[in-house]
Amino acid sequence: LSKDTLMRNSSKIIFMICSILLISGICLRLALPSSTPLRLPQPTPTQSILLLPLDSRPVCSTMVQKLGALAGLNVILPPKACLDNYRTPSDRQKLLQWLQINQSKYDYSIISADNLLHGGLLAARMNTATPTEEDALLKHLQQLSPAKQQAIFSVIPRLLVSDQLLPDRWYQYQLMRYSQLADMVRITGSFALTQELRRTEAKIPAKVLDKYRSRYQQSDRFNLGLLQLATDDRQITFGQDDASPIGLPHASAVKIQSSIAAQKLQQQVQLTYGADEIASLLLTRYYLQQSSWQPKVYLHYTSPKAEGADMPYMAVCVGAALRNQLKLMGASEASTPDSADLICYVNCGNDDFRPSAKQAQELQQMLDKGYKVALIDSSANFEAEELMLPQLLANNVQINKLAAYAAWNTFSNSSGTALAQGLLFCGRLRQLQTAGADTERLTALYAANLNFTAERILEDYYYQKLVHPKLRQKLEAFGINPVELASEDKTKTEQYIQGKLSLQAYKLLHDNLGRTPFYQQNGHSYYLRDLSVGTKLPWARIFEVELQVWTDTGVKTE
């Protein structure tokens, strides 16, 4: 059979399964608690801010918009036509013009230097900017309106070279080993390590090695120049893209930290350990500053070793990464759950630890006490069995009462997203309660937050951990490249994903989210009556998916 026939037959089978389960879902709906449909008010933005994102991926752009909406912030993005599209970089000149025209109109702007300099994160892995390009951008950034606050961020290149670079990627292991050895020699001065470094260098073509080194040299030069622009109203943040505790990215971070200390810029410049989540962290920091609120967060780990665990693609251990993000946002660590505004429940599943019913019951007890809990659900091997969520579902934990949830593939991405959601939700709730908001507005906030949580569950757990691995296998079996989808294959793949996630949304609603009230006040209980999802692939690959979640709410007098 041809590839087209196989895909068509597969789509028909999926459609039939969807139809059967849709009917089953309608029947299951009868099992949900009865409630009267409720039309909730849409949240009204209190302020607009500007975001020039790291790239066009939803997690860097539209997700930040959704987080902002939780806190009453309208996040303005550049026109989509200006932004990157997978292998096509952003139109840097148009982006700069957009920024120059709009920056002075808003009190706060979050600006990715990598998008302006390279055209996005993927382009930054492929392109080495010239000193002339760097100096020109630094000059443009310096000329932005000083009367408006800016948060500019730049990302240190990752340890591994891009898979798109040939022949560079053929020497991936040798380059990684070279990077780590070079840093260890810098730290220790060891003669034995120096000898091993020289042997490793000899295995790499000179042009490939020079290109690899130049990426960090260019990054160091630009970042140290960016450091000079730091003021109280122009904050600078440096991130690390897919790093490790040792390597050239670590050496670059040490240079930046030394310069920050030497120039006494600790209040104006920060270093953090991630990339995709930086805009969400900076959004949260601005909100907390505007609210004059320094929340306290209690860090609770599912296992004794989790705090000191080294997770994949992280430059520091779990505890250090969390404290770094709290400091960056302007939050502090609480010593007890009772003194905290938010509990950060941290799961780091790995070969030695998998969560069980014990952890699920512990989390439910926290929710029963009325604690606001943000769940960071991380897996060292990117396996569903290492996550908390399956245990929560199996033990009927009230997931709809979580303040936040995230389970990205990289720990800092998960922690940054969950902390941002949890703090923005708790902060906005605090504002509304202080202002004496009515029950309807409070319910609308709880419902909006649950909508965001449902989206993260559907993407981080159901898509990334369950659908994505099998989808990759199916595509490869049909001779389709999962990271280079043709237009027709992309459409059929989107249909497949839509069917799978629609079923999971129905199941999630009827098995958990819709079975208990997500909010109760003044003798009224508020339930999730419906949950549906729209899906598409933002780029011609299956690595990420763009979701739009819709929910309906009902009320019941208890």
List PLM regions with ranges:
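An N-terminal assembly and electron-transfer interface module characteristic of large anaerobic redox
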Residues: 35-558
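Short, Lys/Arg-enriched N-terminal segments with co-localized hydrophobic residues
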Residues: 1-6
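Feature marks short, highly hydrophobic, charge-poor N-terminal signal-anchor/signal peptide-like helices
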Residues: 9-11
